């Protein structure tokens, strides 16, 4: 591609045209070719891990200069363990069943027609993301597996890391004899590229934003193409009166402290009043001991180390070692709180009462509902998808972790035998 970085509209038009052409070829690529491309990409990532980490160190220095928060820097950082995780994710996606051409259902009609509904690629996916370089590999792999071309526009913070990973994906495509343009990275930090992508209705079929509330809100507000997204991950954990104390302690600590900067991190703890002075108090003290700032309501602020919560703390995505906590009268009170302040992302109940669990699952409409497990399982890899391109909380098409299967549409194949309609 000729250098068009000083002319962003022309650059994006060129990238879009190349992606559209590549998607037409990739749509009928064999499962074997896609497997080869992904495994070769994984091999390239591991072979170049030192170069990838060196590129990431440039991004980390740039991020510190920009004053990124610790949570954002954590999302940006790559070390050998995280690179190994990227390799594992690529291999996991490679080993999955190819969704393209899968017969979803089929039936016979009295007219003599045989009808099949089969999965097909969406076409061209545009992914706009901020500081997580692993999104480059995850999105590229999932789009390739599902027969879609992808245009990757990473944030300025992850510019070098994303470039190094995209190069590995293109090496995999070359190895498999597939079009390199099936995976393209926008080679400029100019924010005008984002605005161009949002208006590329002729070449992009869906946009997936991965980032903070500001980015996602911008995309949802201005995009002229369909969007798969979630605005915030305001995840709740409700401790029911029937909660097992050991499970409650283990799950809440993991949900809050394992990684605070991800969208599956717990942001609000709701405690049934019957266990507020026992299990609830123990969990709150354990959070404080772990270095978490607990912002509690009137009932909880009496515990040493708790600060009084303000109204703005309810429904806040902290992405930090902070959690809001309050005592609720019962399950229905907890449900009301979640409906009021939640984001339909992921919510969990810790309970041994099957009726309470059933009511929690039935009465909430979050994309992911969890029983007796950490909200940090809200992840495509943990769902057996190998990776995810994002988590969608809308109700159209994809919902929850968006893996390769969710990046397909379908078409009907209708077979007759000289059949006519009377």
From Swiss-Prot:
Database matches in InterPro entries: Ald_DH/histidinol_DH (IPR016161), Ald_DH_C (IPR016163), Ald_DH_N (IPR016162), Aldehyde_DH_dom (IPR015590), G-glutamylP_reductase_CS (IPR020593), Glu-5-SA_DH (IPR012134), GPR_dom (IPR000965)
User: Can you state which reaction this protein catalyses?
Assistant: L-glutamate 5-semialdehyde + phosphate + NADP(+) = L-glutamyl 5-phosphate + NADPH + H(+)
Q: Which pathway is recorded for this entry?
A: Amino-acid biosynthesis; L-proline biosynthesis; L-glutamate 5-semialdehyde from L-glutamate: step 2/2
A single GO molecular-function term is:
glutamate-5-semialdehyde dehydrogenase activity
Q: Which domain of life is it from?
A: Bacteria
Uppermost EC category: oxidoreductase
Q: Its Enzyme Commission number? A: 1.2.1.41
Q: Report any one BP term from Gene Ontology.
A: L-proline biosynthetic process
Alphabetized, the UniProt keywords read: Amino-acid biosynthesis, Cytoplasm, NADP, Oxidoreductase, Proline biosynthesis
What the entry lists under Pfam families is as follows: Aldedh (PF00171)
UniProt main location, coarse: cytoplasm
Q: Name one GO cellular component term.
A: cytoplasm
* UniProt subcellular location: Cytoplasm
Family according to the record: Belongs to the gamma-glutamyl phosphate reductase family.
What exactly does this protein do? Catalyzes the NADPH-dependent reduction of L-glutamate 5-phosphate into L-glutamate 5-semialdehyde and phosphate. The product spontaneously undergoes cyclization to form 1-pyrroline-5-carboxylate.
Official protein name in the record: Gamma-glutamyl phosphate reductase
- Where does this protein come from, organism-wise? Jannaschia sp. (strain CCS1)
């Amino acid at each position: 591609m000729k250098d068009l970085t000083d002319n962003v509209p022309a650059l994006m038009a060129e990238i879009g045209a190349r992606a559209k052409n590549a998607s037409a070829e990739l749509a009928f690529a064999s499962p074997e070719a896609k497997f080869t491309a992904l495994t070769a990409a994984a091999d390239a990532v591991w072979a170049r891990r030192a170069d990838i980490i060196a590129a990431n160190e440039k991004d980390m220095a740039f991020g510190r200069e920009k004053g990124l928060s610790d949570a954002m820097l954590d999302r940006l950082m790559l070390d050998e363990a995280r690179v190994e995780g990227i390799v594992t994710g690529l291999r996991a996606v490679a080993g999955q069943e190819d969704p393209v051409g899968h017969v979803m259902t089929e039936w016979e009609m009295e007219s003599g027609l045989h009808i099949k509904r089969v999965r097909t690629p969406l076409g061209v996916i545009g992914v706009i993301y901020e500081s997580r370089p692993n999104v480059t590999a995850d999105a590229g792999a999932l789009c390739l597996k599902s027969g879609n071309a992808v245009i990757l526009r990473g944030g300025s913070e992850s510019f070098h890391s994303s470039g190094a990973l995209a190069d590995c994906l293109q090496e995999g495509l070359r190895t498999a004899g597939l079009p390199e343009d099936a995976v393209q990275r926008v080679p400029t930090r100019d924010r005008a590229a984002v605005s161009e992508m949002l208006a590329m209705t002729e070449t992009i079929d869906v946009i997936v934003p991965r980032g903070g509330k500001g980015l996602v809100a911008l995309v949802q507000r201005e995009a002229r193409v369909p969007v798969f997204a979630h605005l915030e991950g305001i995840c709740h954990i409700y401790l029911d009166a029937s909660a097992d104390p050991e499970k409650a302690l283990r799950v809440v600590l993991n949900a809050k402290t394992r990684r605070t900067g991800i969208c599956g991190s717990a942001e609000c703890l709701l405690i049934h009043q019957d266990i507020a002075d026992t299990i609830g108090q123990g969990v709150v003290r354990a959070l404080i001991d772990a270095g978490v700032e607990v912002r509690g309501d009137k009932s909880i602020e009496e515990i040493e180390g708790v600060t009084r919560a303000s109204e703005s703390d309810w429904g806040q995505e902290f992405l930090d070692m902070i959690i809001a906590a309050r005592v609720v009268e019962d399950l229905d009170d907890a449900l009301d709180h979640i409906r009021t302040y939640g984001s339909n992302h992921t919510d969990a109940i810790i309970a041994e009462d099957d009726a309470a669990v059933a009511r929690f699952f039935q009465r909430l409409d979050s994309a992911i509902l969890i029983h007796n497990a950490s909200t940090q399982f809200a992840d495509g890899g943990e769902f057996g998808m190998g990776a995810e391109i994002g988590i969608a909380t809308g109700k159209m098409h994809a919902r929850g972790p968006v893996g390769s299967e969710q990046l397909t549409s379908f078409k009907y194949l209708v077979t007759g035998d000289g059949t006519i309609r009377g």
